[in-house]
Amino acid sequence: MRVLGVDPGLTRCGFGVVDGGGGRTVTPIAVDVVRTPADLELSSRLLRISEAAESWIDLHRPEVVAIERVFSQHNVRTAMGTAQAGGVVALAAARRGIPVCFHTPSEVKAAVTGSGSADKAQVTAMVTRILKLAAAPKPADAADALALAICHCWRAPMIERMARAEAAAAEQKRRYQARLAEVKKAGTR
């Protein structure tokens, strides 16, 4: 499974591609950070991020795009910019029919380091070790993008099993409600 991991941000947006093999085998394909100047208009910054995402998707052909979920930050303005950057990346993937999965920072940290409260240095060290890289990816946004891709490779089987279980439960509920409606209808005759 080829995964494009994206650590969204307006100033620095990390992109990392890995191929996931059997078990926990992951192979690095590419990593980079797209920067946008703070003095550009918001729309121009988002356009640059969108164009970069489209380029990465077209070049690397991922089967899924994994994006960091923004759930809260102390700085509302930063959180909004991060969410907007993630949104344009998700849109670029959706336009190409590629599924998008969002993972929280604690899910990514737990998957890669074993601790949901790991710091950036621990995440970078584990990404470097897992991918057998000669040097740590820099800046941290690059390492985070690779961590997102690794996280998705490792969590995808569980996510698929849960989706199947939820679909089966929904179908069972639908059949039960249909049967219940039949019984009620027969009882009113």
Curated annotation (Swiss-Prot):
GO terms for cellular component: cytoplasm; Holliday junction resolvase complex. GO terms for biological process: DNA recombination; DNA repair. It catalyses: Endonucleolytic cleavage at a junction such as a reciprocal single-stranded crossover between two homologous DNA duplexes (Holliday junction). InterPro entries: RNaseH-like_sf (IPR012337), RNaseH_sf (IPR036397), X-over_junc_endoDNase_Mg_BS (IPR020563), X-over_junc_endoDNase_RuvC (IPR002176). One of its GO terms (molecular function) is crossover junction DNA endonuclease activity. Keywords: Cytoplasm, DNA damage, DNA recombination, DNA repair, DNA-binding, Endonuclease, Hydrolase, Magnesium, Metal-binding, Nuclease. Its EC number is 3.1.21.10. Its cofactor is Mg(2+). Mg(2+) 1 binds at D7, D141. NCBIfam families: PRK00039.2-1, ruvC. Homodimer which binds Holliday junction (HJ) DNA. The HJ becomes 2-fold symmetrical on binding to RuvC with unstacked arms; it has a different conformation from HJ DNA in complex with RuvA. In the full resolvosome a probable DNA-RuvA(4)-RuvB(12)-RuvC(2) complex forms which resolves the HJ. The RuvA-RuvB-RuvC complex processes Holliday junction (HJ) DNA during genetic recombination and DNA repair. Endonuclease that resolves HJ intermediates. Cleaves cruciform DNA by making single-stranded nicks across the HJ at symmetrical positions within the homologous arms, yielding a 5'-phosphate and a 3'-hydroxyl group; requires a central core of homology in the junction. The consensus cleavage sequence is 5'-(A/T)TT(C/G)-3'. Cleavage occurs on the 3'-side of the TT dinucleotide at the point of strand exchange. This is Crossover junction endodeoxyribonuclease RuvC.
